[in-house]
């Protein structure tokens, strides 16, 4: 079985009581996991420069990215980075004032980039020089109606609570799509009116794979939509395939191995002050439940069972956003 690249971050060792999410993580990490031997090595440990973060204590985490061939497009909350694998040579870097709580970046079919700037409830398209080519609000409002073009939002620690919280942007032919956490759907931005209704829970990640579009929901489900019909065709509840006495965690990051096996990432649940982020926990938590550590798990969705797990906290990752294949291993 091939190796995996894991994107996330390491939590600070000394935390103040009530520390907010945007101050929790001291370094963005990319690890390589040999799924055969279980060996883990660090490929990238990164801290954003001061000009690209709000304060010295701002969290630094690699969020969700995109792997095309041997090129990895990764992002922090305020930056896009391009790496050539397997050496992880950094060959590109863009940071723009409109980047706030960026959750996902992907290259476009015309050679540009799309970013979900989650903190602004917007999606931006820009070229390799950082010139913004298009911008969309993910809500029924004009872009910038709630924010200012003159503010450098890299210097704003947080804009929470978010009205929508877009987190995964993707293309289907000539259409630009994005998932919306609060609205439980994915919508087409450049052809308004088209929508994939995710409904069962709030989505937080996705992947277009052949004729299937996979989405994770925060409570631990995989939602599969048909690329042709843009309709949900299957829902797999990973909680039903796992230890019923354990709280799986925030479900973010997925990688199909084949039509039946899929890797999924889970981040340990921690307390948060934002009501919208704990509703799903209240719906599944029962007395006696233990919160599982940050981990990845391999599921057989055909037999509906968990095949194996890997604890990531032992290797320094406390939050995980992305899982990508090492095609050379």
Where are these regions (language model features)?
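Surface-exposed loop and turn segments in beta-propeller and other repeat-based domains
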Residues: 40-58, 94-98, 133-162, 233-247, ...
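Blade-loop segments of beta-propeller domains
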Residues: 41-106, 313-314
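Loop/turn-rich, solvent-exposed surfaces of beta-rich toroidal or solenoidal domains
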Residues: 205-297
């Amino acid at each position: 079985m091939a190796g995996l690249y894991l994107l996330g971050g390491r939590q600070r060792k000394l935390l103040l009581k009530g520390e907010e999410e945007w101050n929790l993580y001291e370094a963005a990490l990319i690890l390589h996991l040999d799924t055969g031997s279980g060996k883990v090595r660090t490929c990238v440990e990164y801290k954003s420069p001061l000009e690209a973060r709000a304060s010295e204590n701002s969290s630094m985490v690699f969020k969700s990215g995109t792997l095309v061939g041997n090129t990895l497009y990764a992002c922090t909350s305020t930056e896009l980075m391009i790496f050539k694998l397997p050496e992880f040579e950094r060959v590109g870097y863009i940071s723009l004032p409109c980047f706030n709580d960026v959750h996902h970046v992907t290259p476009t079919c015309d050679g540009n980039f799309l970013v979900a700037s989650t903190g602004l409830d917007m999606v931006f398209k820009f070229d390799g020089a950082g010139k913004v080519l298009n911008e969309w609000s993910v809500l029924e409002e004009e872009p910038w109606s709630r924010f200012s073009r003159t503010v450098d939002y890299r210097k704003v620690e947080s804009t929470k609570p978010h009205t929508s919280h877009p987190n995964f942007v993707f293309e289907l032919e000539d259409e630009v799509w994005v998932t919306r956490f609060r609205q439980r759907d994915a919508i087409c931005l450049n052809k308004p009116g088209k929508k994939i209704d995710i409904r069962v829970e709030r989505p937080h990640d996705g992947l277009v794979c052949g004729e299937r579009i996979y989405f994770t929901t925060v409570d631990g489900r995989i939602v599969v939509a048909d690329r042709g019909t843009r309709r949900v065709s299957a829902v797999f509840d990973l909680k039903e395939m796992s230890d019923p006495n354990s709280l799986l965690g925030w479900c973010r990051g997925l990688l199909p191995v084949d039509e039946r096996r899929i890797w999924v990432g889970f981040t340990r649940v921690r307390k948060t002050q934002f009501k919208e982020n704990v509703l799903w926990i209240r719906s599944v938590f029962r007395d006696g439940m233990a919160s599982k550590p940050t981990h990845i798990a391999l599921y057989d969705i055909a037999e509906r069972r968990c095949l194996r797990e890997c604890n990531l906290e032992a290797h320094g990752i406390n939050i995980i956003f992305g899982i990508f294949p090492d095609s050379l291993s």
